[in-house]
Amino acid sequence: MPERLPEFYTAVYRLVSRVPKGKVVTYGQVAALLGVPRAPRGVGTALRNLPRPLSKKVPWQRVINASGGISFRGDVIRVEEQRWLLEDEGIEFSRHGKVDLKKYRWVGPKRWKTPKWKTQL
């Protein structure tokens, strides 16, 4: 793992770390808040590459897909872990495995400073 994280990853981690307990945000929502609305997959990549030491500080489990589901990453154990962590925070799932985004979606910070890397594009 490189010593320095890509600036986009750092911006994702900073934003996701602000999602309160008991709330969720979508990959697309994170991308839009960062000023790159077409980059939800980049958000997923950043979270998939979250360094182990940061996983205690960045609540990665609070990021779900636009339909309210947990995105399968080829690792059933991680999917189960994410659901368990969310349920532990009081988030309920439908019988179809979906989170009610109307109830649990975090709308984002009241003020969000555009990341430095974005202003340099």
Regions found by a protein language model. Give the residues of each.
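Nucleic acid-binding interface residues in structured DNA/RNA-binding domains
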Residues: 1-121
